[in-house]
């Protein structure tokens, strides 16, 4: 720790911060529709992602109805079931979670948390949302074309993805790949904005080691996405060329419908490498912003400094780097060179080390804290419990010997949903409860919020713990109907019915949450400027919700790190980052 006198701290510039003239909206259209304000763009991203996410939620209910009560619902057939799987998975992983964490929280929080007036490139930021919206519309249009959306599975493996026997082989796969290409273009415009804003638009005194961990998580995830998404982009373009022009990048010589196909010489394994080189970093593109947000929620609602701030930062960076050398643990049964499995199993276990550091630091932050069991805190605790449980099952799947018999069973589905479904959604919900007062100026209803949490949290475990057991029994995933297979015990059918009932109940809780959002917007209690008594800059704006340009006439000056809670001798139990020190005081640049 290096001590620097306060009168010098304000003169430490992390970057030049010119007070540029902002674009000022001149009409309702330029203020709320074609807005260049990052806060409005964040809300647009969030609403669009939530809308398409509701579609994915409905698809999951339809799949559960079929699995729980097979043959009861005649409007669901085998082809549609495969299409539902594909669309549900792709929407949740990319169009919902990536868009919410980076496009939603990233746009709203980065400028406020670093003390900037807006993103560095507001016009490009606006374009990024509209390209994302176009990608969502192209994806959704697949429901309305002949043949419907593709049923190739959300990983889109060739040759199945473009063979004539696959549902949605005509327009469905073309629209899916086109939508992915558009999404990546839109994200690249937004992602460059996030990175440049963090590096170049921080206010005076905001050194990198004073950034809130939310910003560190979003920043690192964005850098990862800018490196990982090109692999998916290239794979999507090449697969689209295979489908439309008859090239054979990924299509081997094979017999299709009794005749030798027009393809030959391609490698399906190459596509799997490209997809998972994107796919596993994508897990942490979603997880790292969640890690950062949870750190801020825990510190704020436990009224305690985050434990091991620098270690937490370096753990985020280490996870981001290691995530690029573990992708092939998704391919143990793909036919790749067997000895590669030992390398990727080793790197998979190594990445657990920085992840464990974060978990221990969260626990130590809670230790002897003044814990307030607010709704955001409940969701943060729910995330930690869920992520640890999901991570422990990941240790099984990271081991080659164990993964082979569990591959393509419901165990994989349960693990993936705990880590990439329930855990990040817990963070999204906790973050909404936490920052909703900043966005709207009103508090969400606490009773409805706690009802929402407990039904969601307990329901998730009642869904996915039995699903792990089904996987251990050997119940396969992606089956439209299990039938009377000898290796499936009768208890599996009863468990599937139980899981379906619980899933529908959890879905009802999300409707209560939506009601809470809308009702509180008009009838919620006024929040004031800083209802959680938080230290970070977004809570120190002169207006709530923040006005155009965020900071009025003068940008804030940062004097301390982001987690000054329960400071001995202080007038209150928190000290905001922009609060000037007493005359002659000395403060460290970073903990």
From Swiss-Prot:
Key word Heme present: yes
GO function terms (MF aspect): cytochrome-c oxidase activity; heme binding; metal ion binding
Reported function: Cytochrome c oxidase is the component of the respiratory chain that catalyzes the reduction of oxygen to water. Subunits 1-3 form the functional core of the enzyme complex. Co I is the catalytic subunit of the enzyme. Electrons originating in cytochrome c are transferred via the copper A center of subunit 2 and a low-spin heme of subunit 1 to the bimetallic center formed by a high-spin heme and copper B.
Assembly information from the UniProt record: This alternate cytochrome c oxidase consists of a subunit I and two cytochromes c. Equivalents to subunit 2 and 3 are not present in this complex.
Organism: Bradyrhizobium diazoefficiens (strain JCM 10833 / BCRC 13528 / IAM 13628 / NBRC 14792 / USDA 110)
Matching SUPFAM superfamilies: Cytochrome c oxidase subunit I-like
Positions with a binding annotation for heme b 2; high-spin: 415
Sequence position, cross-link 1'-histidyl-3'-tyrosine (His-Tyr): 280-284
Residue spans crossing the bilayer: 40-60, 90-110, 126-146, 172-192, 215-235, 274-294, 313-333, 337-357, 377-397, 412-432, 453-473, 498-518
Catalytic activity of the protein: 4 Fe(II)-[cytochrome c] + O2 + 8 H(+)(in) = 4 Fe(III)-[cytochrome c] + 2 H2O + 4 H(+)(out)
Keyword presence, Cell membrane: yes
Family recorded in the similarity comment: Belongs to the heme-copper respiratory oxidase family.
Name this protein carries in UniProt: Alternative cytochrome c oxidase subunit 1
InterPro entries in alphabetical order: Cyt_c_oxase-like_su1_dom, Cyt_c_oxase-like_su1_sf, Cyt_C_Oxase_1, Cyt_c_Oxase_su1_BS
Alphabetical UniProt keywords: Cell membrane, Copper, Electron transport, Heme, Iron, Membrane, Metal-binding, Respiratory chain, Translocase, Transmembrane, Transmembrane helix, Transport
């Amino acid at each position: 720790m290096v001590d620097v006198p306060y009168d010098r701290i304000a003169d430490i510039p992390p970057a030049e911060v010119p007070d540029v003239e902002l674009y000022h909206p001149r009409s309702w259209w330029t203020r709320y529709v074609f807005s260049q304000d990052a806060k409005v763009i964040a809300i647009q991203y969030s609403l669009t992602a939530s809308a398409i996410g509701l579609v994915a939620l409905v698809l999951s209910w339809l799949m559960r109805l079929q699995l729980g009560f097979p043959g009861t619902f005649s409007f669901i057939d085998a082809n549609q079931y495969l299409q539902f799987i594909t669309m549900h998975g792709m929407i949740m992983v990319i169009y919902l979670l990536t868009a919410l964490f980076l496009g939603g929280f990233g746009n709203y929080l980065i400028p406020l948390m670093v003390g900037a007036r807006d993103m560095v490139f507001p016009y490009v930021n606006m374009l990024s949302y509209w390209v994302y919206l176009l990608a969502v519309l192209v994806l959704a249009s697949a429901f309305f074309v002949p043949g419907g959306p593709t049923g190739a599975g959300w990983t889109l493996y060739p040759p199945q993805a473009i063979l004539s026997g696959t549902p949605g082989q005509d327009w469905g796969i073309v629209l899916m790949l086109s939508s992915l290409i558009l999404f990546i273009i839109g994200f690249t415009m937004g992602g460059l904005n996030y990175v440049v804003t963090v590096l170049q638009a921080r206010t005076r005194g905001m050194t990198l080691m004073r950034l809130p961990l939310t910003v560190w998580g979003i920043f690192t995830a964005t850098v990862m996405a800018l490196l990982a998404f090109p692999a998916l982009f290239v794979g999507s373009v090449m697969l689209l060329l295979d489908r439309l022009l008859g090239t054979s990048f990924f299509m081997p010589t094979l017999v299709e419908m009794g005749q030798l196909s027009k393809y030959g010489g391609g490698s399906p394994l190459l596509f799997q490498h490209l997809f998972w080189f994107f796919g596993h970093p994508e897990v942490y593109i979603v997880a790292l912003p969640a890690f950062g947000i949870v750190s801020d929620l825990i510190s704020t609602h436990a009224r305690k400094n985050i434990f091991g701030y620098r270690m937490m930062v370096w753990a985020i960076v280490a996870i981001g780097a290691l995530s690029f050398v573990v992708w092939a643990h998704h391919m143990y049964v793909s036919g790749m060179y067997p000895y590669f499995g030992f390398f990727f199993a080793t790197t998979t276990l190594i990445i657990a080390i920085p992840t464990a550091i974060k978990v221990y630091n969260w626990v130590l932050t809670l230790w002897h804290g003044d814990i307030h069991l607010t709704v955001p805190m409940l969701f943060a605790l729910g995330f930690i419990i869920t992520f640890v449980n999901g991570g422990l099952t990941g240790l099984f799947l990271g081991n080659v010997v164990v993964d082979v018999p569990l591959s393509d069973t419901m165990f994989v589905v349960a693990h993936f949903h705990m880590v990439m479904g329930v855990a990040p959604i817990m963070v999204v919900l906790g973050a909404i409860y936490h920052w909703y007062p900043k966005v709207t100026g009103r508090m969400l209803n606490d009773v409805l919020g706690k009802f929402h949490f407990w039904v969601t949290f307990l329901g998730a475990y009642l869904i996915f713990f039995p699903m792990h057991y089904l996987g251990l029994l050997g119940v396969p995933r992606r089956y439209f109907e299990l039938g009377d297979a000898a290796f499936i015990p009768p208890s599996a059918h009863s468990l599937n019915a139980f899981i379906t009932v619980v899933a529908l109940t959890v879905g009802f809780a999300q409707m209560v949450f939506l009601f809470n959002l809308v009702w509180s917007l008009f009838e919620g209690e006024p929040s004031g400027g800083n209802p959680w008594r938080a230290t970070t800059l977004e809570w120190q704006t002169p207006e709530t919700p923040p006005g155009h340009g965020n900071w009025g006439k003068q940008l804030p000056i940062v004097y301390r790190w982001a987690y000054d809670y329960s400071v001995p001798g202080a007038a209150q139990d928190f000290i905001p980052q922009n609060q000037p020190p007493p005359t002659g005081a000395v403060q460290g640049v970073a903990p």
